[in-house]
């Protein structure tokens, strides 16, 4: 019986489409997208009708062109200053510090918090080569100096990186602005969770029970 594992004439590189390989490599440049995530995204996209694929890609390209960080809080928005920072009814006496825009939007869905946000655009992670200087911490200190908030709420993710980031920022605030109250969101969910994926009830309790 002929062995089907032998006499293979074509190399994998000859079979796998070059355009697909390049697309996957491009997707993998997006943070948190590895080989598996990129493949899942691309193959699911290819299952759609051609017109639907085109529609999705056009929407993504349009969003990339208009979206930018708010010049005040760094929340992703389609304006120079986001609706939250430009809303006079929002109290600048409360600044909620989050790692990413999606965390702020998760809290906004609760429709309870009436302060403003500050998006760090990441977290401190030495093993990944991310230091405090790579985040928007300096801008946060400037906002605290400018607005003299009553309270700064540290709502970084409940994981090792989030804790390290929160502790670093808390130390800075204590040294520079000793009169400012610093609170940390309570753990109403499992350590290692991401705020953007936490259910609304748990997130609301975490904000309410901050200390």
Swiss-Prot record:
GO terms for biological process: double-strand break repair; recombinational repair. It comes from Aquifex aeolicus (strain VF5). It comes from the Bacteria. Keywords: DNA damage, DNA recombination, DNA repair, Metal-binding, Zinc, Zinc-finger. One of its GO terms (molecular function) is DNA binding. Belongs to the RecR family. Residues 93-190 form the Toprim domain. May play a role in DNA repair. It seems to be involved in an RecBC-independent recombinational process of DNA repair. It may act with RecF and RecO. It holds the Pfam family Toprim_4. InterPro entries: DNA_Rcmb_RecR, Rcmb_RecR, Rcmb_RecR_Znf, TOPRIM_dom, TOPRIM_RecR. SMART domains: TOPRIM. SUPFAM superfamilies: Recombination protein RecR. Gene3D superfamilies: 3.30.60.80, 3.40.1360.10. The lineage of its organism: Bacteria, Pseudomonadati, Aquificota, Aquificia, Aquificales. The gene is recR. A zinc finger (C4-type) spans 70-85. This is Recombination protein RecR.
């Amino acid at each position: 019986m002929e062995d089907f594992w032998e006499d293979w004439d074509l190399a994998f590189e000859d079979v796998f489409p070059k355009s697909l390989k390049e697309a996957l490599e491009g997707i993998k440049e997006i943070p948190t997208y590895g080989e598996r995530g990129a493949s899942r995204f691309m193959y699911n996209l290819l299952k759609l009708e051609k017109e639907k694929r085109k529609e999705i890609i056009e929407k993504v390209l349009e969003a990339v062109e208009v979206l930018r960080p708010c010049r005040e809080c760094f929340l992703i928005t389609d304006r120079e200053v986001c609706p939250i920072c430009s809303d006079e009814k929002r109290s600048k006496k409360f600044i909620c510090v989050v790692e990413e825009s999606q965390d702020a939007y998760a809290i906004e869905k609760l429709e309870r918090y009436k302060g403003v946000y500050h998006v760090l655009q990441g977290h401190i992670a030495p093993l990944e080569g991310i230091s405090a200087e790579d985040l928007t911490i300096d801008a946060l200190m400037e906002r605290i100096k400018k607005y003299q908030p009553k309270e700064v709420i540290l709502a970084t993710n409940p994981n090792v990186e989030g804790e390290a980031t929160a502790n670093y920022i808390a130390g800075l605030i204590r040294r520079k602005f000793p009169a400012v109250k610093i609170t940390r969101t309570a753990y109403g969910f499992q350590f290692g969770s991401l705020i953007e994926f936490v259910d609304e009830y748990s997130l609301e309790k975490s904000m309410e029970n901050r200390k």
